[in-house]
Curated annotation (Swiss-Prot):
Organism placement in taxonomy: Eukaryota, Fungi, Dikarya, Ascomycota, Taphrinomycotina
A GO-annotated cellular component: cytosolic small ribosomal subunit
The species this protein was found in: Schizosaccharomyces japonicus (strain yFS275 / FY16936)
Highest taxon in the source lineage: Eukaryota
Keyword Ribosomal protein annotated: yes
Protein name: Small ribosomal subunit protein uS2A
C-alpha cells in the first residue's frame, strides 16, 4: 500500500493491511468526535463509522518515529487502564525497554514528586484517552507529549499523536501495539525489515484469567493421567517379574540340597540307650575285685 510523504520502505505491506482488517481495527463506533472526522472513511447503514486503514498505518509509522527519537527507552511510559491493553503494554515494554503502567493509574505519578511511584517520562503512550484521562491530564501539566490509540468517539484533548483504530477490541488493541513495537525495533535497527519478526502477534492479545486456569487444570489432569498410566504399566511389569522370580533358582536348590546331605542327624549319632549300656560296668563285679 503506497502512501506519499515518506520513503517507500515505510509503506504498509499487504499482510499488514490484512492483519489490520482481520483484527477489526477499521471498525469504529456509532458516535463521532468532530476532530476524528479526518480519519473516517465512511459511515455504514447501521451507523457504525469505518476508519481509514491507510491513516492508521500513517500514524503508526509517525508514532514509531517519535518513539525512536528518545535516547533512553525507559523514558517512554506506556499506560493502559483498560484490561484488554494490560498484556499489550507489558509486552511492548518488555520488547522496547519502555516503562509500563498496567492497571489503575495512581494520581500524582507525573506531578507529585513525593509519591513513591513518581516518574518523569519524556513521552506517554496511552491505550484509550477516556480510560487513561488522568494520565493524559497530568502529562499536559508537565508538558509531556502524548501518543494514544483513538476511536472515532475518543476526545483528542491533550493528545499530540492520535492513532485511529478500534481501541475497544482486544485483538485490535494487541495488533496495533504489536505493529508499533515492531516498527520501533525496525527503526532502531534491532530487527531487519527483510525478515519477519519472531514474536507472534498473539503474545499481545488479552487472555482471560479463567481461560489460563482452565488450561493449567487441563495440563495438571493430563500429567496426572500420564503418571497413573506409568504407574499401572510399572505394576504390570512388576507382576510379570514377580511371577518369573517365584520359580526356584537351580543353583540355590543345589546348594540347599548339599547342605541337607552334609547335616548330621540325631538319630545317626547313636542310640542313647545303647551307648549307656556299653559304658556301664557291673558294680558287684567291681566290688569283688577290690
Amino acid at each position: 500500500m503506497a502512501q506519499a510523504g515518506r520513503p517507500s520502505i515505510l509503506n504498509a505491506t499487504d499482510d499488514d493491511i490484512k492483519q489490520l482488517l482481520a483484527a477489526s481495527c477499521h471498525i469504529g463506533s456509532k458516535n463521532l468526535d468532530v476532530r476524528m472526522e479526518n480519519y473516517v472513511w465512511k459511515r455504514r447503514s447501521d451507523g457504525v463509522h469505518i476508519i481509514n486503514i491507510g491513516k492508521t498505518w500513517e500514524k503508526i509509522v509517525l508514532a514509531a518515529r517519535v518513539i525512536a527519537t528518545i535516547e533512553n527507552p525507559a523514558d517512554v511510559c506506556v499506560v493502559s487502564s483498560r484490561p484488554y491493553g494490560h498484556r499489550a503494554v507489558l509486552k511492548f515494554a518488555a520488547h522496547t525497554g519502555a516503562t509500563a503502567i498496567a492497571g489503575r493509574f495512581t494520581p500524582g505519578n507525573f506531578t507529585n514528586y513525593i509519591t513513591r511511584t513518581y516518574r518523569e517520562p519524556r513521552l506517554i503512550i496511552a491505550t484509550d484517552p477516556r480510560a487513561d484521562a488522568q494520565a493524559i491530564k497530568e502529562a499536559s501539566y508537565v508538558n509531556i507529549p502524548v501518543i494514544s490509540l483513538c476511536d472515532t468517539d475518543s476526545p483528542l484533548a491533550h493528545v499530540d499523536v492520535a492513532i485511529p483504530t478500534n481501541n475497544k477490541g482486544y485483538k485490535s488493541i494487541g495488533l496495533v501495539w504489536w505493529l508499533l513495537a515492531r516498527e520501533v525495533l525496525r527503526l532502531r535497527g534491532t530487527i531487519s525489515r527483510t525478515s519477519p519478526w519472531d514474536v507472534m502477534v498473539d503474545m499481545y492479545f488479552y487472555r482471560d484469567p479463567e481461560e489460563i486456569e482452565r488450561e493449567e487444570e487441563a495440563k495438571a489432569a493430563a500429567e496426572a493421567e500420564a503418571e497413573a498410566a506409568a504407574t499401572a504399566e510399572a505394576a504390570a511389569e512388576f507382576e510379570v517379574t514377580d511371577s518369573a522370580a517365584g520359580t526356584v533358582d537351580p543353583s540355590v536348590l543345589a546348594a540347599a540340597t548339599a547342605g541337607q546331605v552334609g547335616e548330621s542327624s540325631w538319630e545317626e549319632a547313636g542310640d542313647w540307650n545303647t551307648t549307656g549300656a556299653a559304658q556301664t560296668s557291673d558294680w558287684a563285679a567291681t566290688a569283688e575285685a577290690q
